[in-house]
C-alpha cells in the first residue's frame, strides 16, 4: 500500500495529494470542534454523512452553473477535488438572526432578516476569525475588488439554491459559511466554490419546530448530533438510515 502525501490537515478534513496534477483527495474526519477548537469531540460517522451531503450539494450546484472544486466521491470518506488557491476568508450568508449576529446586534434568535446579509471573516483561529470589511480585504491583498464582487454574487446564488433545496424538505436555512479558491489558467484566475457544504457549515432548523439539525447541537450540548445530521441526509434522499459501524468500518 502506497503512503499518500498529506498536503494539509484542518479541524474536520485532511487534504492528500491527488492522482493527477491539479487534483487533491479530501478526507472527511469524525473530529468535531467549536469555539476555535477549544471544544473537541470525535463523533463516529460524522465524516461519512458530511461527505455524502457535500457531494450531493456540490453536484447540484455544478449542474446549475455554480462551479466548484468537487469532481467525484471516491468512497465513504473521500472525494476527489480540484486543487485551488484558497482565499483566506470565510464568507457567511445570513437569512435569520442567530449566533454571533444575534449577540452583536441584540436580535432575538429566529428573527427573519430584512434581506440576506453577507459577511467576511479572516480564516485565523489564533485571532478568532475576526470579521473584516472589504477595505481590509483589498488593502491586505487577500482578494481583489472584482474577486469580492464574484464571491458575493456566487454566495447569493448558492443561498438562493440552498434556501429552495432545504425548504422543499421542511428545513429552514438560517445561515451558512462557504469558502472560495482561485483556479489559474495561464496568467488569469477565476473564483470557484471550495471546501464543503454540510451541517457542519450551515445552520439548519426544522421548519415546523425550529429544532436544530446542525453543529449547534454540539456547540450547545443538545445531544443527538449524528442523528440530526442523518435526518438532514434522509430528508435530502441521500441516506435512509444512520450509518452503522461494522468491523471498524462505516456502512
Swiss-Prot record:
InterPro entries assigned to the protein according to its UniProt record, in alphabetical order: SAICAR_synt/ADE2_N, SAICAR_synt_PurC, SAICAR_synth, SAICAR_synthetase, SAICAR_synthetase_CS
Keyword match Cell inner membrane: no
EC number(s) per entry: 6.3.2.6
Keywords, ordered alphabetically: ATP-binding, Ligase, Nucleotide-binding, Purine biosynthesis
Reactions mediated catalytically: 5-amino-1-(5-phospho-D-ribosyl)imidazole-4-carboxylate + L-aspartate + ATP = (2S)-2-[5-amino-1-(5-phospho-beta-D-ribosyl)imidazole-4-carboxamido]succinate + ADP + phosphate + 2 H(+)
Entry keyword annotation includes Glycoprotein: no
Pathway: Purine metabolism; IMP biosynthesis via de novo pathway; 5-amino-1-(5-phospho-D-ribosyl)imidazole-4-carboxamide from 5-amino-1-(5-phospho-D-ribosyl)imidazole-4-carboxylate: step 1/2
Gene Ontology biological process terms in this record: 'de novo' IMP biosynthetic process; cobalamin biosynthetic process
SUPFAM superfamilies: SAICAR synthase-like
Any Pfam family the entry gives: SAICAR_synt
GO molecular function annotation: ATP binding; phosphoribosylaminoimidazolesuccinocarboxamide synthase activity
Enzyme class label: ligase
Example of a GO cellular component annotation carried by this entry: cytosol
Family, per entry: Belongs to the SAICAR synthetase family.
Official protein name in the record: Phosphoribosylaminoimidazole-succinocarboxamide synthase
Species the sequence originates in: Phenylobacterium zucineum (strain HLK1)
